[in-house]
Each structure stands twice: as C-alpha cells, then as structure tokens.
Amino acid sequence: MEIHRLNSYTSVDYLCNSSNNVYILLGDTDEFINKRIILLMNNIELYYVYEISVNDEDELYHSFITSNVVCPIKQRINLMLYKEYKKVIGSCVINNEGNIKMYSQPDKLHVYVLCYRCNGDIKTITMIKCHQLLKPEKEIVIDGYQVNDSSFFYTSPNLIKQINMDKSDLFYKNILLRKEINCLIRKQESSNLYCILNKHIVSLSDTDIWKVIISDELFDSSDIEKLVKFDYDRDKFHAFVRAWYSGQLSNCKEENETIKTVYEMIEKRI
C-alpha cells in the first residue's frame, strides 16, 4: 500500500480512472477531503458519511451520520441501498441538510464516501480518517518499566484499563481504532474494519486502489512509523516471544530462572 505525505501527494484524474479509490487518512487531513469534493463537485451523484467507534463490549460498530439524499424507510444510506432504492422507486429524496462536515473526535473513525459517474458507471472515493493519535498525558509505568511508546498497547489494548490515568477510556478507544487501522494496512483479509466497511458502508474489491495519506506534522513521527510499517498481530508476538525464550536458555540454572521470569512477565502482558 502506497504511503504519501499530505502536501506531497499529486492528485489523479478520477474521471479517467476506472478503479475505485480508498484512502486511509491519518492526522488532520481535512484539506485532502475538501480537495476531493471540489475536484468532483460537478460529478458527485451521492455522498455520505459514517462513523466507526467502539462499544461497551469492545467491538467496532458503525453509525450513519449524513448524506445528500434520504432513504425514508431505512433512515440511512450507502451505495448499495442507493442502487436498490433507485430500482424500486426511481430516485431518492434530496436532503438539503446533508452537508459534509469535518469531524475530529479521537475515539471515532470517520468514513467519507463520494460516489460519482465515470463512463456510465458509479465509482467511489472512500476516505477513512483517524484524526488524532493520542498520547498519555502523564508517564506510564508497567511492571517497573516506563512506557514511552503508544504502540506498546497495540498488541493488548486492555492493559490501558488497568492503568490509573486521566481520560483512559478515550485513550483506550483511540488505541483500539489505531490497532484496527494497522490491521487494515498490514493484512486486510483478517481486518474487522475491512469487514464493516465492505458489509455496511461501501462495496470493496480487489481492484480498488488503496493509499495512506499522512498529515505533514505526523509524517516523520515514530508513532506513524510503527503504525503503518509493523504488524501487531498477537499470535505472531507470542510466537516470537516463545522463540526468543527457547533461544536464550543455557546450562546455567540461575540465568535460566531470570530468563523465565522475564518471559512470563512479557507473556502475561501480550
């Protein structure tokens, strides 16, 4: 998946591009969204916005926010419903209140979908925005070790619930959503976020063009480096830790006890 700095990204001519485009937006990238809207202003047939957050069971859920058309029966819309609705009734009701707004809540992802006509077909630009990468306001210490890196929690976000910190719920949800973004970038086939997008928000296919767009202020940060380039799958981490443990053992009993203590501590925290 291509990764681009916001101000260095060269736009494409969407009206000459037969593929659907999907963008993962990290940081304050409202400028990018607005530019896509302006580029396609005269060709947009449908646009809509959803939000994705985390419920009390720590599961992702989606909510419809707004659109330029209304489906009175469903009280929501997406491209799949739009096509179905047009077949039955012939047209949808224009929603004059459905203006696109920019959202920045750190405990939500916002999905902007622009649907436009291209060579007689409806094509889509889908933009999945994670507006903020939160950091703890105070120093965090776990098992005597100072945690300076938020990516520490990607393999096990539930550790945050065990820490006495301000706004822990907000930080927890932000980390969980970032973990889902990481999975979407690194291995779509097992991504819960991909499933929600494809089933409830916009149809995705193997021919879609995916790109990551990162705000200038975040592009060179270590948070971004680890979010987009590393795999935080827990099973892989467990396998790595077990392999490390086996490789460290020797004929020295005292040294093996120390290694075992460290191994058990790490295994417990993953």
Swiss-Prot record:
User: Is Transferase found in the keyword set?
Assistant: no
Highest rank taxon of the organism:
Viruses
Q: What induces it?
A: Expressed in the late phase of the viral replicative cycle.
The record ties this protein, via InterPro entries, to: Poxvirus_D3 (IPR007660)
Q: Does the keyword Repressor apply?
A: no
Q: What is its main location?
A: virion
Keywords, in A-Z order: Late protein, Virion
A GO term from the CC aspect: virion component
* Subcellular location, record wording: Virion
- What does the record give as the function of this protein? Late protein which is part of a large complex required for early virion morphogenesis. This complex participates in the formation of virosomes and the incorporation of virosomal contents into nascent immature virions.
Q: Which family does it belong to?
A: Belongs to the chordopoxvirinae D3 family.
Q: What is this protein's record name? A: 27 kDa core protein
